[in-house]
Amino acid sequence: MGQELSQHELYVEQLKKALKTRGVKVKGNDLLKFFDFVKDTCPWFPQEGTIDIKRWRRVGDCFQDYYNTFGPEKIPVTAFSYWNLIKDLIDKKEADPQVMAAVTQTEKILKVSSQTDLRDNSHNKDMDLISLESDDEEAKAPSEKMTMSNKSPKKYPAMLASQNNNTDKDPDLSEVDWDGLEDEAAKYHNPDWPPFLSRPPPYNRTAATAPAVMAVVNPKEELKEKISQLEEQIKLEELHQSLIIRLQKLKTGNERVTSSGNIESHSRTPKWPGQCLPKGKYLINKNTEEYPPKDIFPVTETMDGQGQAWRHHNGFDFTVIKELKTAVSQYGATAPYTLAIVESIADNWLTPTDWNTLVRAVLSGGDHLIWKSEFFENCRDTAKRNQQAGNGWDFDMLTGSGNYANTDAQMQYDPGLFAQIQAAATNAWRKLPVKGDPGASLTGVKQGPDEPFADFVHRLITTAGRIFGNAEAGVDYVKQLAYENANPACQAAIRPYRKKTDLTGYIRLCSDIGPSYQQGLAMAAAFSGQTVKDLLNNKNKDRGGCFKCGKKGHFAKDCRDHSNKNPESKVPGLCPRCKRGKHWANECKSKTDSQGNPLPPHQGNGMRGQPQAPKQAYGAVSFVPANSNNPFQNLIEPPQEVQDWTSVPPPTQY
């Protein structure tokens, strides 16, 4: 015991030093208690004698199970902390020489102690594993313990003594006086006696025995035994599944009986160069395969680790079927985009049942019947060529009818037969009639009110490519639709340059038109009481032409277009000036009215300016005598006198 304690103290000191190098200080007593707890919860740990990260994680799992079972009261507080610290040391033992030395020393001590425990267990197989002695008795000398072991046990001494005595004093049953015993027993059944207040406890003469000693089992040996059993079970299951697959192939006639007895080495290989097999999404576990598979899935073939080929069904991707259905509805069954999806699906191994199910799901009833008739016709032509070639692939195999109506039989077809079915199905699809207007879906692509013009053009080009196969073929049509299906703001920006630039020019012109531009147009239209479209049309209207005819190059007074005269002009009535004749008053030239009275002359322009002040000369004025013979003198007023100089200032206002 002292040697074991010294060894424990030795590797505890090693661990303390290793933890100290990492800046962690721990107490030696706490580590000793921790390893005692490890030994109690994980008795296998000292026996294996190896410390690595895998075994140390097993110790952590044991701690967690112990915690879940007995609760936090039964586990030391520092148990998980020390476990994490030692885990970090084990993870980095390669980089630290001191930690490596501590782990190596601990493994040696564990191996020595485990060997000592095994030798002690082999010599003392009948030793009681549960000690009934107290902790104080364990501290006594070994001599005292030997003396105490020779004494009788302290617990239940009377029962054990009676048991030992009775084993020697049991009488022979043949010598018992049974009549006397019955008379004595009858005395204990007197009805006049009062009943017992309580039944006496049953007397158990068997002494409490210690639990049996369990033999120490090496966990490595037990694990190896379980692994060998599992490997044997896996081999038998693989053999069983391979026999089932081979039996199905023999029933369908796709496998020839060979003299080779190695069933696991059988695998299907390509029969001609360049032939490729469809790849499955993952390797299927043969233990979980379901037979028979569902009847609506394409066939895939995978290879396991031993080279064995396994065929199974994987489900159609729902997004692919949805995309094909959408393409058929929007662009038509024979559009290039739709045919591209069909060809991508046909790259897999599809049985005739798979093709029939797929076509029925995405095409209308009439188109499905047309496809089926074309498919059968193609299969008849292919079957005739196969008959001439002598490969045995007849009409029933190509169409999945007759003896090959079951999907299990179709699943075992050769790759060449799958290729013939693919060609017949895709050729039948290409012969479907064109319905409706292919450009109807293209004209339905319109720009949203807040959608950028570049995104709208991209949608337009994508749709045109799916309909025409090549967007360059309908570039003029796309350019026209880019203007007609654009929103009013983009149309107003493109209109002046519509015939002067191409589609890229349209994109440049509308690159700045965004939500803020649309908001400004809406506000301007609201203030002007117009719609956005009317506002943009009036804004771009040219006002530089003739007001009379609207043409450029002349004014209204020079316009020679007499066809635009207003036919609804008023006819002048009776002249208000002369009261005779129908003409306008400003055009009246009469001197008298209808009564013969003279009419005043016209007053010129009819506009009179500001009256002027009388003109008067100040200062010396020369006098000209009046001459009656002057023809220009028509004044009657008397002649003015000669004015002298005056000091009167001129008038301030006229």
Swiss-Prot record:
Any single biological process term in GO: viral budding via host ESCRT complex
Site (Cleavage): 100-101, 160-161, 214-215, 297-298, 523-524, 618-619
Chain coiled-coil ranges: 215-251
Zinc finger feature spans (CCHC-type): 544-561, 573-590
Keywords, in A-Z order: Capsid protein, Coiled coil, Host-virus interaction, Lipoprotein, Metal-binding, Myristate, Phosphoprotein, Repeat, Viral budding, Viral budding via the host ESCRT complexes, Viral matrix protein, Viral nucleoprotein, Viral release from host cell, Virion, Zinc, Zinc-finger
Prosequence residues removed at maturation: 101-152
Residue span of region Disordered: 132-152, 588-654
Top-level lineage group: Viruses
Motif (PPXY motif) on chain: 200-203
Annotated GO CC locations: viral nucleocapsid
Entry annotated with the keyword Nucleotide-binding: no
Protein's UniProt name: Gag polyprotein
Sites of N-myristoyl glycine lipidation: 2
Organism this protein belongs to: Simian retrovirus SRV-2
GO MF: nucleic acid binding; structural constituent of virion; zinc ion binding
